[in-house]
Amino acid sequence: MSDSKHVTYEDAGVDTAEGGRAVDAIKQMVKDTNRPEVIGGIGGFGGLFSAAALKDMEDPILISGTDGVGTKLVLAQIMDRHETVGQDLVAMCVNDILASGAEPLFFLDYVAIGHIEAEHMAKIIKGVADGCKLAGCALVGGEMAEHPGVMAPADYDLAGFTVGVVDRPKMLDPANVRPGDVILGLPSTGVHSNGYSLVRKVIGVDGIKPGTPEAAAKAEELSRPLEELGGASLADTLLAPTRIYVKPILELLRAGANVHAIAHITGGGITENLNRALADDVDAVVIRNGAEMGWDVPPVITYVSRQAELAPNEACKTFNMGVGLCLIVAPEDEAAVTEALVALGEKPFRVGECVEGSGKVVYSDEC
């Protein structure tokens, strides 16, 4: 290439100095998530975590999980609100491994972004660190990848990875679920992190670029209080972070509660997640009467479902319908588990019951 000229990495769009500033900005946040097992700090080629404590378990099983936040990030970017999407990221991973009864030990994050700005990155990672503290796991490492020419400067995507542990004799197993078992639910904060491809179409943000006058106008519109949401705004309710259920559930299990299985209600809603916690010969019958569930559904889910004109079955396989986590227990244990959850500050409610079947979710208004 005779016409070539000297080109630096910075000329290509990668600002390594700003990347260094970003690392400096998050060091204390990361350190604040440390557990005693963490060895060293960030900056090495790998995160170090001592496994010595696992020797106290009869048969320790490591359980891993990975996930992202999905297109909820589009809304966060349009609103220029980045402080809580990190909690969403942690929640999506740790709640998944919690379904096996596992304690999350450590977490790693990956941020792909068009252009790194230290202050912007600090907001994102603060949410990750806050989520790790809520889950009791250590943020032992991560990656900030600048993608100039591939992503717009303000665009970013998140991915997370967690590893946890459970003692094999205490591992939750859907095979233990029996006809007659009761399904309890714990409330969600709203939409959590699934269904946003539909949400984006309903609220009209598709095609809007962050940082533009269009984005500013849409952000102002979404920040207005709505009567249908009890005076809250779409921005606040749709960006409410995903709940992290780890601490109350682990405390419940460590106290000896007899829980047969747990389902984290994410993409696919109740219909396509509760079935993952069922034995092959058991169906779940979920309480529903037409468009009304057997418990209070967050107004934002009702609002979006109505705006999209979703039929009840479609809503139930798109959104969590106000149920972030389901616990399946024997009928004789329902009262004790409910009482224990209330003592832990939770507000459990009955979602349905288990009957003989083939491992599927059905609704009481269809039976």
Predicted stretch roles:
Residues 2-37:
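N-terminal amphipathic/basic leader segments beginning at the initiator methionine
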Residues 28-189, 285:
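Glycine-rich phosphate/pyrophosphate-binding loop regions near the starts of catalytic domains
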Residues 26, 48, 93-94, 199-202, ...:
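Buried hydrophobic packing segments
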Residues 66, 157, 170-230, 234, ...:
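Short, acidic (Asp/Glu-rich) active-site segment that either coordinates a divalent metal cofactor
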Residues 15, 67, 180, 264, ...:
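Residue-level signature of catalytic and energy-coupling elements of molecular machines
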Residues 23, 122-125, 196:
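Hydrophobic face of alpha-helices
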Residues 12, 16, 80, 189-192, ...:
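Hydrophobic alpha-helical scaffolding
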Residues 2-11, 120, 124-138, 151-158, ...:
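Glycine-/charge-enriched secondary-structure boundary and capping motifs
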